[in-house]
Amino acid sequence: MWVLALGGAFLAVAKACIFCRLQDHALANRLAQLNNQTKPKWKWKEWASPDFSAFALDEVSMKQVTEKTHRVLRVIEKKGSTSLIPLYWQWLQKTRIPQYTREALCAPVCRGSTILYNCSTCEGKEESCWPQKHCYPDSHDLWDARILLLCIFGIVLLSGVVSLQVEYLNLQAKDL
């Protein structure tokens, strides 16, 4: 029963971004073969979420994720260590794909708009780039930089006026 459930999980995640490009790597078939070799040691629901609709990647990122998955599966196939699949899959879903999604929608990669591929359907759609504040919430935008420069300029100007006044008073004291 567990083998069937695990097989269902692999088929469900077969809609993921890693299967959208580079078909010659046959990742879906290789993942199915690894699944057939697996004795279920883990609960598939804990790691194999079939919902990839929150993720969208550009062409370059999708190829990078596919190549990375190809290399990881090759290592798993050579070692015969199928227990690494859930760890890799969790890392992919929780860390790498969200990072690539953010990079694809933020400057400097994105300029105005970009074509992103939905990771569930593999269909491309033109999307607007995210605003700077959304991409880098802790960073200062151009308006903040202007205010900072004006404050620094004001402080320097004020210290210059104070310094000039002190020098003027010193010169007057020497003349007397």
From Swiss-Prot:
The chain crosses the membrane at residues 147-167. Disruption phenotype: Males are healthy, grossly normal and exhibit normal mating behavior but are infertile. Sperm are morphologically normal, exhibit normal motility and can penetrate the zona pellucida and bind to the oolemma but are unable to fuse with the egg membrane or penetrate into the ooplasm. No effect on location of sperm-egg fusion protein IZUMO1. Almost all Tmem95-deficient spermatozoa are unable to fuse with oocytes; however, a small but significant population is unexpectedly able to fuse with oocytes. It is a single-pass type I membrane protein. GO terms for biological process: fusion of sperm to egg plasma membrane involved in single fertilization. Residues 168-176 are cytoplasmic. Residues 17-146 are extracellular. Disulfide bonds join C17-C119, C20-C122, C106-C129, C110-C135. Keywords: Cytoplasmic vesicle, Disulfide bond, Fertilization, Glycoprotein, Membrane, Signal, Transmembrane, Transmembrane helix. It is found in: Cytoplasmic vesicle, Secretory vesicle, Acrosome membrane. Glycans are attached at N36, N118. It comes from the Eukaryota. Expressed exclusively in testis. InterPro entries: TMEM95 (IPR027984). N-glycosylated. Residues 1-16 form the signal peptide. GO terms for cellular component: acrosomal membrane; sperm plasma membrane. Belongs to the TMEM95 family. Does not interact with sperm-egg fusion proteins IZUMO1 or IZUMO1R/JUNO. Sperm protein required for fusion of sperm with the egg membrane during fertilization. This is Sperm-egg fusion protein TMEM95.
